[in-house]
């Protein structure tokens, strides 16, 4: 809605000449931003390299590394929701800088990705042109906010000097394998040495020395942390690219563009993140992260303990994984994922006699039924398949043998079983699993009770109980039955104990243009070869156009063709990779957008290093473990990382994985990238929709008689009001430029920090911004005479006891609040103190200078200006920050509630050191208490020290 955004409310001639208003704020802010830039106020030194102290001095031991989740530079620029986290981290960094800490705070840009590429496709403009223009605008907008960044350390993931090291890290991971005995990554060269020495033998019994060069390469490729696999992927013909599971909506459509997505088997680059499942889980315990985020990661990794069980068939054994092997006697059918490798082998040519018609999918033969079913589910996402309440499936015409009792059970395919989880096959126990129960009811399959405690005629029962109908397990409890059946399966060679995970390996290729090229080439036989580090960076070539080949969105049979295929001269190269000059073909996929953000914290520590990702000394200084400060289990990492909870799983999981590989290989000393994480909330605002549910510009909506109207192109219409996250999609954005123009950046900073706790979402109301502005005007008036512009502070005015106590309580409280990111309560304390100074007319320097210093993290431009006018010739950016005098933190008096028979009837104020007798006397003397006593003498007086007095009548 349109709201007034101007500060003055009186005619210009009545406004004091030196009032703090938008114009003066703008002048002050521009001047101090220029001063900070010229002086390098926020530049911070490294132990070694180009950013080391030029005088040879050591860097301070007391450091602080603060980091924001860096922005994607969209063409729309910032809205007021974006700076929330940036301002909060700036307040935090400024506070610790004033305490004397060596603070690293910088901001780069996560600039690869689909939006810039789509714009390039539409306009023919190179994505870099659009991206760099967007970055210029972002830097301009962010610069207005007065963020204390070391701008020398800024970069974009699209900078060649940056993605050279993204490619380098890819090669380190590619040239590594995970040694399960040592529970860590090791270099491929060490694996080769073990095979050559005989220390390690091949699982299939072959002799390493007898293998050809190609066979050895195949063996090694099977160990690599980066590998190619024929895997089920999410193919989006409408975008011309493969999508990760996380980029597909629950409706089976692309998150961007809303195109249909199909499950398809393609050869793709994968990263073996699953090798780190246990370490990714275990190290969550040593991180100072929100429990919600830890839970999300634990659930995503999804560790479960159970058993693998082999069911014999006429073709081959079917391996299933189950967390409830105790229920094996209740398995009445098997279900395979429709994509399971054995489906085409097991399916029969004709239906067995007496096949239930419900099992046939309406087809004449099992093969026809399987083909039809696969076609019908091709567009479903994994999430949609698992959440689908209507159970569908097809009988393969084949049976398997239950190893527990030797009975034959039918084999089905169904979409609720996923190829990517476990073995892609389940033993269905309808008495113990609700999805199996629903399927059994739908298809008329037996339901057997194997654990007492439920009513399987009504629903499955998955709880504990006593085993029944389970042969030798009968009478056991569930835990004992699990151990007994696993022992039997292992003895019979039909199963074994096993741990399984929901986490899948990371699909690491995209059929796009605007991303990091792979440092991989293929020889004439199609074998992949990593490029030597000397060949980095592999730069993106220019292409005639930037779009992948797009297909009919519904064409599930289409095949991806990346846009880099069009750069034919770049694709075909002559290289000497150790066997003489040969012809090779470059990989034409690009890395996913997650790649650049999976390691950027490291580059902040050493952004100009041409020879290393980062020098070990710099990483160890900024990110190394500090057990003396953080405890013996400190994993190291960035001291504070702030960003949205929407990145709780993907970005944070991927960056943890990369960091752990680099740790294992000895490149970093920290075993985690981010020691502490805080998720900021969203800024929300009213949005408005027309009768069709289409959003209309909130700024154009008018409120009249409790209703809302929009003056659309066809005349005014009534619209509906709702509340949501501020942003482009809801058409309720407010630009920070607008607020800076009308009030100043310091006002925006104070307003956003005052709106509520950082972690909570909060409502935006432009009309309320003036409150923050008026607070800063009061701070200004405490120091500056608005009429003359002179400093009104006096040197030796004595402070009253009340002012002294409030001052030092404010100092103590603000210090605690800033350290805990409670900027809203810090602002409240500063407002209270400022109001006191104004009301009492306090002009003493001893009372006012601490206020200016305490305001500095929130409103740095104003504070710097006032500090200078108070006669200081150095910036306050590096302190000092006021310290509270303990003698003024002790209360002289304490208020106690007084109860009569357990109900509060009055309050007394007594000396802080009053004894029990004094408390009792004061309580009995209180007029309100006397009225309730009505002359009666209490039978008992109970004094709870520090809390209350209770009179029992």
UniProtKB/Swiss-Prot annotation:
InterPro entries, per database record: aa-tRNA-synth_I_CS, Leu-tRNA-ligase, Leu_tRNA-synth_edit, M/V/L/I-tRNA-synth_anticd-bd, Methionyl/Leucyl_tRNA_Synth, Rossmann-like_a/b/a_fold, tRNAsynth_Ia_anticodon-bd, Val/Leu/Ile-tRNA-synth_edit
Superkingdom to which the source organism belongs: Bacteria
Subcellular localization: Cytoplasm
Keyword Disulfide bond on entry: no
Enzyme type, top EC level: ligase
Any one Gene Ontology cellular component term annotated for this protein: cytosol
Residues that bind ATP: 728
Motif range ('KMSKS' region): 725-729
Motif 'HIGH' region: positions: 71-82
GO aspect biological process, one term: leucyl-tRNA aminoacylation
Main location as per UniProt: cytoplasm
EC annotation from Swiss-Prot or TrEMBL: 6.1.1.4
Gene Ontology molecular function: aminoacyl-tRNA deacylase activity; ATP binding; leucine-tRNA ligase activity
Keyword Ion transport listed: no
Catalytic activity: tRNA(Leu) + L-leucine + ATP = L-leucyl-tRNA(Leu) + AMP + diphosphate
Key words, A-Z: Aminoacyl-tRNA synthetase, ATP-binding, Cytoplasm, Ligase, Nucleotide-binding, Protein biosynthesis
Protein family according to the UniProt entry: Belongs to the class-I aminoacyl-tRNA synthetase family.
Protein name as annotated: Leucine--tRNA ligase
Lineage: Bacteria, Bacillati, Actinomycetota, Actinomycetes, Mycobacteriales
